[in-house]
From Swiss-Prot:
CDD domains: CCT. Residues 275-291 have a biased composition (Acidic residues). It comes from the Eukaryota. Disruption phenotype: No visible phenotype under normal growth conditions. Coiled coil: none annotated. This is Choline-phosphate cytidylyltransferase 2. It catalyses: phosphocholine + CTP + H(+) = CDP-choline + diphosphate. One of its GO terms (molecular function) is choline-phosphate cytidylyltransferase activity. The keyword Hydrolase does not apply. The keyword Zinc does not apply. The lineage of its organism: Eukaryota, Viridiplantae, Streptophyta, Embryophyta, Tracheophyta. It comes from Arabidopsis thaliana (Mouse-ear cress).
Length: 304
C-alpha cells in the first residue's frame, strides 16, 4: 500500500527533503478498538510528513509469547487495513525488532507507549529496549479505560447472558460449547423473560394507580370550588329568567290595558283608576310567585 507522500521518494537517499519520515508501530491488535486507533493516529501524526507502517504478529508467535487471540491473524490484518491512519500493513511482524528488520523496511522511528513491554521471548527485559538505545523510539500515550483484556473480561463477567442471547438467536449448543448446560440455561432464560413480564405489568399497575390517585386528589381539592361555581351560575340564570318573565307579564298587561282603554273610550265610558291599581297588584303577585317556583325547582335539581 502506498500514499502520495511515499511516491515522492526518489532513489534511496534518506536525506531528501521530499522523503516522508517512515514510522513503524506494531502490536497484536486483537478485537481492534479505539484505543488501538488512537495509538496509530499518534504515530501517524508524529511528523508533518509521515509514512506509517504497522506490523502485526501472526497467530503462531502470538500464541507462543502472549496467548490465544479471539481474532485470527487474517482478521487482525484486515482490521488494520481499514484504519485510515495506516499506510501499510506488515504481516508476520517479529516479536523483537532487529537492525535487519529496520533496515529492510527503511524504518526511521518506532512508535509505542513508553511503558516497558516485557520480552517473554527471553531476548531482553523490554521488547523496545534496542530501538530506545539507538534513539529511534517515538513515544505515544495509552488510552485509559479500554483494552482487549478489558473487553474480554466484560464478556466473561456476563458469560451466561451472552450464551442465553445467542441460544435465543438460533446458535446450537455445539457452536457455543455448552452442551451440558443448555437445558439449565434455557430454563433460566424463560424464567428471566417471565420476571421481566411480571416487572413490566407491575410498573403498569403502579402507573395506573398513581394516575387514579392524582385524579382523586384533584377532585377533592376542586370539588367545593366547582359546586360553588355551578350554584352561582344557576342563581344568576334564575335571576335573569325571573326578570324576563316579569318584564313579559308587564308588557302584556300594558297592551291589555291599552286595548281596554281604547274600547272603553269608544263606548264612552270612564276607566276607574282604583280598579287598574288592584289589577296591577294582582299581576305583580303572580310574577313573583312564578319566579319563586322556578328558583325552588333549580335548587331541587342541584341537590339531586
Amino acid at each position: 500500500m502506498s500514499v502520495n507522500g511515499e511516491n515522492k521518494v526518489s532513489g534511496g537517499d534518506s536525506s531528501s527533503s521530499d522523503r516522508p519520515v517512515r514510522v513503524y508501530a506494531d502490536g497484536i491488535f486483537d478485537l481492534f478498538h479505539f484505543g488501538h486507533a488512537r495509538a496509530i493516529e499518534q504515530a501517524k501524526k508524529s511528523f508533518p510528513n509521515t509514512y506509517l507502517l504497522v506490523g502485526c504478529c501472526n497467530d503462531e508467535i502470538t500464541n507462543k509469547f502472549k496467548g490465544k487471540t479471539v481474532m485470527t491473524e487474517s482478521e487482525r490484518y484486515e482490521s488494520l487495513r481499514h484504519c485510515k491512519w495506516v499506510d501499510e500493513v506488515i504481516p508476520d511482524a517479529p516479536w523483537v525488532l532487529t537492525t535487519e528488520f529496520l533496515d529492510k523496511h527503511k524504518i526511521d522511528y518506532v512508535a509505542h507507549d513508553a511503558l516497558p513491554y516485557a520480552d517473554t521471548s527471553g531476548a531482553g527485559n523490554d521488547v523496545y529496549e534496542f530501538v530506545k538505545s539507538i534513539g529511534k523510539f517515538k513515544e505515544t500515550k495509552r488510552t485509559e479505560g479500554i483494552s482487549t483484556s478489558d473487553i474480554i473480561m466484560r464478556i466473561v463477567k456476563d458469560y451466561n447472558q451472552y450464551v442465553l442471547r445467542n441460544l435465543d438467536r438460533g446458535y446450537s449448543r455445539e457452536e457455543l460449547g455448552v452442551s451440558f448446560e443448555e437445558k439449565r440455561l434455557r430454563v433460566n432464560m424463560r424464567l428471566k423473560k417471565l420476571q421481566e413480564k411480571v416487572k413490566e405489568q407491575q410498573e403498569k399497575i403502579q402507573t395506573v394507580a398513581k394516575t387514579a390517585g392524582m385524579h382523586h386528589d384533584e377532585w377533592l381539592e376542586n370539588a367545593d370550588r366547582w359546586v360553588a361555581g355551578f350554584l352561582e351560575m344557576f342563581e344568576e340564570g334564575c335571576h335573569k329568567m325571573g326578570t324576563a318573565i316579569r318584564d313579559g307579564i308587564q308588557q302584556r298587561l300594558m297592551r291589555q290595558e291599552s286595548e281596554e282603554n281604547r274600547r272603553l273610550l269608544q263606548n264612552g265610558l270612564t276607566i276607574s283608576k282604583d280598579n287598574d291599581d288592584e289589577q296591577m297588584s294582582d299581576d305583580n303577585e303572580f310574577a313573583e310567585e312564578d319566579c319563586v317556583n322556578v328558583s325552588n325547582k333549580g335548587i331541587e335539581t342541584v341537590k339531586k
